[in-house]
Each structure stands twice: as structure tokens, then as C-alpha cells.
């Protein structure tokens, strides 16, 4: 039996109701095939799929770049403020069903402005849906603007310029897209500028890239959180540093499986991270492409790694303590976890 539970079913029910935050979610990565077809029809965009089954069959990846190729293709159906509203509203409904009480979501404006979609169109649609989710479900949110690392720092600077009128709705900046060959050092100046504007900073590092990329994210980008961070475990000194500094890692188990970062979910390093006192969290990354929202990720690692009640509570607590909420808001959520557990 799982430690702290009478059965696997009891653990699953515990996960379902456990209050949690999600800190690593790309809103464009929550585009379900049904919505893909709806937006394509709505905007008269041709897509290379005849059916929803065709789309799901295409969601077979061997690495990050395989996924990114189809991710950007899917993004092409998003044109209007209503599209971004509907996309975000659909994710928020799923998050609510998974007992998610706070979300910090990434958006990729460069993937839209390059297609002629205005920055304002993107952010207004997303924030309208986030406001609606707070009113409807009580879910609070933060928005993180991600720079695409396969593009230049100058292009990131231009995107930050476009964001200036909307800084009241943007909590931070991040770094995503193709990791290998695009080290954090490439974006040192634009991250410094973002910090000077009062924005939080996060970066994808150590997913496919080496531990050195995690060090660069810490030392050069001065990030508040590391997104993924799996390969940090290859460097004991880095692990010790991350643990000593209470650096949150936003880990994405089903993403790691789908992108072949791990060969089997039983090989996932999440439990090793917890045992090393790393502040790991569980997140869904791009759930429509990787086969599961946040509770499915919790369930997958709970089953494969035989996580205990204490492990699950730690993961949920980490998701709030690692968030960009105020200390008072964090305390309220931690009290809710304690009352539930």
C-alpha cells in the first residue's frame, strides 16, 4: 500500500482534491485538438489534419524540437482576442477541476506577433479569461512573458518594448523554445532590463541543455525559479547550491516522458530531487501535447515512484512557496493544504 494511504484509489482521490498551484504551463500548449479545429474553422486557416485522431497521432515526439515544430504550427490558428480568451478559459476550467488554486502561466507573444497578431490582442484575450477565472472559480493568476531563445536578444528586447504598456498585467519574463545551442548567456542584457522594470525572472534550463545552462540562468539571468532543471542532478555542487538557496524547480513529468528526457516514468528523478531537498514542483507544461493536465502528472509520478502522503503534501506546498504570490497569500494556501491533509 502507498505510504499514508489505505489504497492506490485513496491516494488518487487525495491528489484530486489536494489544493495546488501550477507554475509551468504554456497557454499555447493547452490547445486541445477540438479547439484547434474550431479556431481553424473560425479563422479559415488550413491545417494538415483531417480529424482529431490525425492530430493526436501527430503528437508523437522524440525530442524537444519535434514537439516545437508542431507547437508553432498549432499556434497558427490563434488570431483574435476571442481565440486567446477561449483558449485560456478552457485551461482555467481544467485547472479548477484539478483543484488548482493559483496559476502562473507562460505566453509566447513572439509566436503571434511574427504572424501579424498584435501583442495587445494576445494579452487582452488571455487576461480577460484570467479575470473571469478568478471571478468564476477563485483561481488567482500571474502572467509570464516568455522570450523564444532560438530568436535573437534584439528581438527579445523589441518584445519587451511592446510589453511596456501592459506591465501591470505581467509578473515576469521567462525563456523557452529550443534549449541546446541557445544558452541563457545569450539573453543576459534583456533579463537585466526586465529586472530593472520590477519583473520576476525564470528560465527553462537543464531540460535538454547541460547543468552549465542552469548555472548561467542563476548567475547571469539571476532567475527567481528554474523551469525543468532535471540535468542539475548531474552536478552535485549545483544540487547543493540549489538546495541551499531554496530555488524552486518547476518539473514536468509527462512532458519529460513524451519528449524522451526520461525513457520511462519510473526513471523520473522527481523523488531523487525531493530526497536531495530540492524544491521541486509538479506541472503539466504543454498538457494537450503531452497527454495530461496537472493531476495526471501527479498521478503518474505517484504511481511510478510510489510517492507517500508526505511527498505529495511537500510538492503541493512547494508549488505555493515557489510562486510569486505575497507571503500572506502563500500562508493562506499553505493553511488550506494543512487543513486538507
UniProtKB/Swiss-Prot annotation:
Gene3D superfamilies attached to this UniProt entry: Metal-dependent hydrolases
CDD domains in UniProt: ADA
Binding residues for Zn(2+): 24, 26, 204, 285
Recorded GO MF terms: adenine deaminase activity; zinc ion binding
Pfam families found in the cross-reference section: A_deaminase
Catalysed conversion reaction: adenine + H2O + H(+) = hypoxanthine + NH4(+)
Site feature location: Important for catalytic activity: 228
InterPro entries noted in UniProt: A_deaminase_dom, ADE, Ado/ade_deaminase, Metal_Hydrolase
Cofactor: Zn(2+)
Cofactor note as given: Binds 1 zinc ion per subunit.
A GO-annotated cellular component: cytosol
Active site: 207 (proton donor)
GO biological process: adenine catabolic process; hypoxanthine salvage; nucleotide metabolic process
EC number(s) stated in the UniProt entry for this protein: 3.5.4.2
Keywords: Hydrolase, Metal-binding, Nucleotide metabolism, Zinc
Residues annotated as binding substrate: 286
HAMAP family referenced in this protein's UniProt entry, alphabetically: Adenine_deaminase
Summary of the function given for this chain in its UniProt record: Catalyzes the hydrolytic deamination of adenine to hypoxanthine. Plays an important role in the purine salvage pathway and in nitrogen catabolism.
Alphabetical list of PANTHER family matching this protein: ADENINE DEAMINASE (PTHR43114:SF6)
Family to which the UniProt record says this protein belongs: Belongs to the metallo-dependent hydrolases superfamily. Adenosine and AMP deaminases family. Adenine deaminase type 2 subfamily.
Name of protein: Adenine deaminase
Amino acid at each position: 500500500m502507498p505510504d499514508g494511504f489505505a489504497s492506490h484509489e485513496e491516494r488518487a482521490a487525495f491528489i484530486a482534491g489536494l489544493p495546488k498551484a501550477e507554475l509551468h504551463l504554456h497557454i499555447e500548449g493547452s490547445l486541445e485538438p477540438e479547439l484547434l479545429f474550431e479556431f481553424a474553422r473560425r479563422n479559415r486557416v488550413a491545417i494538415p489534419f483531417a480529424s482529431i485522431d490525425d492530430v493526436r497521432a501527430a503528437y508523437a515526439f522524440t525530442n524537444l524540437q519535434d514537439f516545437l515544430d508542431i507547437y508553432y504550427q498549432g499556434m497558427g490558428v490563434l488570431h483574435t482576442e476571442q481565440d486567446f480568451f477561449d483558449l485560456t478559459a478552457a485551461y482555467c476550467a481544467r485547472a479548477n477541476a484539478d483543484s488548482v488554486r493559483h496559476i502562473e502561466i507562460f505566453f509566447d507573444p513572439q509566436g503571434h506577433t511574427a504572424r501579424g497578431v498584435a501583442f495587445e490582442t494576445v494579452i487582452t484575450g488571455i487576461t480577460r479569461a484570467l479575470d473571469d477565472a478568478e471571478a468564476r472559480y477563485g483561481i488567482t493568476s500571474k502572467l509570464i512573458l516568455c522570450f523564444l531563445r532560438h530568436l535573437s536578444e534584439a528581438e527579445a528586447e523589441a518584445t519587451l518594448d511592446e510589453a511596456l504598456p501592459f506591465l501591470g498585467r505581467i509578473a515576469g519574463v521567462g525563456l523557452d523554445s529550443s534549449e541546446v545551442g541557445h544558452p541563457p548567456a545569450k539573453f543576459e542584457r534583456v533579463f537585466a532590463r526586465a529586472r530593472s522594470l520590477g519583473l520576476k525572472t525564470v528560465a527553462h534550463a537543464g531540460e535538454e541543455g547541460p547543468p552549465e545552462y542552469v548555472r548561467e540562468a542563476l548567475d547571469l539571468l539571476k532567475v527567481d525559479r528554474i523551469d525543468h532543471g532535471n540535468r542539475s542532478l548531474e552536478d552535485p555542487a549545483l544540487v547543493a547550491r540549489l538546495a541551499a538557496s531554496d530555488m524552486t524547480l518547476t518539473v514536468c513529468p509527462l512532458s519529460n516522458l513524451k519528449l524522451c528526457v526520461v525513457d520511462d516514468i519510473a526513471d523520473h528523478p522527481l523523488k531523487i530531487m525531493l530526497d536531495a531537498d530540492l524544491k521541486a514542483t509538479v506541472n503539466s507544461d504543454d498538457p494537450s501535447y503531452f497527454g495530461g493536465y496537472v493531476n495526471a502528472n501527479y498521478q503518474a509520478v505517484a504511481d511510478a515512484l510510489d510517492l507517500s502522503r508526505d511527498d505529495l503534501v511537500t510538492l503541493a506546498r512547494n508549488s505555493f512557496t515557489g510562486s510569486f504570490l505575497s507571503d500572506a497569500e502563500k500562508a493562506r494556501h499553505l493553511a488550506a493544504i494543512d487543513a486538507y491533509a
